[in-house]
């Protein structure tokens, strides 16, 4: 049985190439070497080659949707950032506490550089210089892989000061949850 999505006319589940999960089949999918070998950070390079407002408009016009249950348009969300308030931050919630949900966990465990690149592009488009990335306490492998990927990205010049020789700088701060007892009390 196939299903269609009202917000993506013409889309039938299962009839498109894998985009988010395309690297999952590789045993070393979480490394910077695999990420770069499969065109990783090309989106960041492309974003930095144009004005931030153009990147924001491109995401908005492409109707890129969030991965949460509401499918909120990313370009719209990025536009909600108050322009007159400083400092501004990107906060990424990797808690994924909905029962039976593993979409974010798999991305963090198997392709953390894709998450980091997305954070960087969002920060660039929205004019942000710091990102806080929260990962649920029970997700030890996700924590390990994201931390290792972030160290690789800093060492390679994808995160930090003057990214890839540009005037754009972003720091990403990782925060681990402590775990939950029943419902987090």
Which residues make up each language-model segment?
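Feature of Fe-S/electron-transfer and energy-metabolism proteins
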Residues: 1-185
């Amino acid at each position: 049985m196939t299903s269609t999505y009202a917000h993506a006319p013409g889309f039938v589940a299962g009839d498109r190439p894998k985009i988010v999960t395309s690297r999952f089949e590789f045993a070393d999918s979480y490394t910077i070497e695999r990420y770069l070998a499969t065109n990783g950070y090309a989106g960041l390079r492309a974003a930095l080659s144009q004005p931030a407002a153009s990147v924001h408009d491109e995401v908005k016009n492409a109707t890129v949707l969030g991965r949460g249950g509401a499918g909120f348009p990313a370009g719209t969300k990025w536009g909600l950032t108050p322009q007159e308030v400083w400092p501004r931050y990107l906060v990424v919630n990797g808690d994924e506490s909905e029962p039976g949900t593993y979409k974010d966990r798999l991305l963090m465990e198997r392709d953390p550089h894709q998450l980091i690149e997305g954070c960087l592009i969002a920060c660039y488009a929205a004019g942000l210089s710091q990102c806080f990335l929260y990962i649920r306490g029970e997700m030890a492998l996700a924590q390990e892989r994201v931390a290792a990927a972030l160290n690789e990205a800093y060492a390679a010049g994808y995160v930090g000061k003057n990214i890839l020789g540009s005037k754009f700088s972003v720091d990403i701060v990782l925060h681990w949850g402590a775990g939950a007892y029943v419902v987090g009390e």
